[in-house]
Amino acid sequence: MSSRAVTIGIALLPCLAAAPLAAQTRPAPLQDPVATMKAGRPIPGPVFETRNFTRAVENGTRDRTGRPGAGYWTQRVRYDIEAQLDPSKQRVTGRERVTYQNRSPDTLRSVPIYLRQNLFAPGSPRRESVPITGGVTLSRVEAQGAAVPQTKLDSETGPAGYEVFNTIMWIRLARPIAPGDSAAFAFEWSFTPPPSPSDGRQGRESDVYFLGYWYPQVAVYDDVNGWVTDPYINGAEFYMDMADYDVRITVPRGWVVGATGTLRDSASVLNARTMERLAAIRGKRDVAHIISASDPGPGAALASKGSTLTWHFTATNVRDFSWGAGNHYLWDATSALVPNRARGTTDTVAIHSFFRNSAAAAAWPIGGARFTRDAIEQLSLWLWPYPWPQMTSMEGVLTSGGMEYPMMTLMQPWADTLSLAGDLMHETGHMWFPMQVGSNETRHAWMDEGLTQFNTAQAMRALYGEPRTGGRSNDAEPGQRASYTRAARNGNDAALMTWSDLFPLNLYFIDNYNKTAQVLVALRGVIGDSTFHRALIEYGRRWTNRHPDPADFFNTFENVSGRNLSWFWVSWFYRAWPLDQAIGSVVEDGDSMAITVEDRGLVPMPVNLTVTRSDGSVVHVSIPAEEWLTGRRSITGRVPRVPAVLKVQIDAENAFPDLNRANQMWVSGGAER
């Protein structure tokens, strides 16, 4: 059987190659990306560029090639935190010192601090119901070395004071923070962690506590938007600056703690036998039982001094810090070996897995540590090397799915091993997006969830093959495609550029996760596998430890591919347009077979035809997307009539998320479908 590729002659029009972008000459379009109408169909216009982004380009902090500008900056923060968990009172108390460095060119007169546990305070706005715990109790607020009183903030000027607006506290400073200067803040606070199930991201059970967004955290001040203070309402996730953490967590003796960062002074909390077990697996891919079901409880693995133990962790260059504690945890550990091609070395990443001995969590002793190790190694190969010294996966408090934090994932108690593997792959994938490439999840969930969903499918296919029996359908491209197309066929779709908290709840997962993943598959089909992968890696290289805007993602892919893809971005991101390409007819026309393709949807996409002949040969025919931009609804092309054409199929490789596969195939002697 032979195969060859041709581009068919389009009736009356030449086939147009995609026009390359001139080097940094594309103007900044400010109009709405609504389509102009040609021949009754909408034609996507240029990508909308926000005024804030245009101003950042003018200020030299952004560049329309997708690179950070020469004057790009981010702020820097350090957190020193001491926290205590009292399970008998179901209470967490803490105190912290924050050092905030203003690396922007602007003078800051007020600073907003997130108090996200106020989601659980009476009267706080929220998208879904949650347990009411009372929220955060502040017992001390200090800025620039002096106590700050609670007051009404009617203006940016005036004496120092603070006011709490649900999940955000604004502090008006006694002295503005000039460019290049730093300011210190101190807080003492307490709260009751919500009972599980709470909000799907943290909580408590009788024997497990997991603390996410648990401490006062400075909001992001960036070069595009200034202070970003979207309230936390239990819909969209987060937007955070990179920071350094030094955290001490005091828990009752017998409770094991896992956390973001590296455990320091381990001899103060672990006994000699436990430390020997950890040392024995350092640099090895074997899985070791640090605390096993045959051990006499977690307390036997710990130091025996006093009624409490203080676990000390440090983490460098992470955007957040989370931790979990349990008094019935088993603990497995191993090592991931991550080749670092740039240095010609292999990095060792310590892998920790904490889980309870239960039928509901039956997959964890089989795969908790192993799947986490495999995810780190595979994603490091697909993307770029994992940068931190450890990774922890923890079972508990969630009733569905998982949640990501730097160097840490929280999971439901999976019993099915392949489902656990997929869940761990997805949440571990977030260690790249957004934990390194720090997009604003609060506004653009697709930038981390969609990319991670796409990367999950690639890594799962590499490790476990495809199709697979069992597991979660959304961890593979076919399942992602089915999820999106099923919803869209029923009219349930939204533009991906819809701000995250404004997404209809029934579409948040379908569109931000699965639709985006399928749009990336389609983009790969448009620009080619190798170009797509180069652009993805380049986007990560440019924006690791930085805050990309959607325009930076779009511009990077155009810059790397050398193509103007405005029609693609507008169609798939700014509009909820359907794709429906159909075989209109296949008829004899002299010495040729005339193949008419109809565009019955709205998205202009390339047409990839597979023509199968009677001698077994296969001809691949392509029509560029630009042909639809003239307003056409149908295009007719021709191939030689001999050898006889037996079958014509659109997109045989399922590269594009077409809503109606039933009209994409014609078979000789049969009904057109």
Functional labels for PLM-detected ranges:
Residues 108-153, 252-255, 612-622:
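Solvent-exposed beta-hairpin/edge-strand motifs
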Residues 24-93, 205, 566-567:
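N-terminal, polar/Ser/Thr-rich
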Residues 220-226, 236-425, 454-457, 466:
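Hydrophobic helix-coil surface modules that form long, contiguous segments used
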Residues 258-259, 586-651:
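Beta-strand-rich binding/interaction modules
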Residues 123-134, 190-245, 266, 331-336, ...:
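Glycine/proline-rich low-complexity spacer/linker segments in large multi-domain proteins
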Residues 96-98, 102, 113-117, 173, ...:
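Short, hydrophobic/aromatic-enriched beta-strand segments in well-ordered soluble domains
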Residues 23, 43-49, 53-62, 313, ...:
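Hydrophobic alpha-helical and helix-loop surface patches within well-folded domains
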Residues 34, 39-40, 91, 101, ...:
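A surface-exposed beta-strand-loop module
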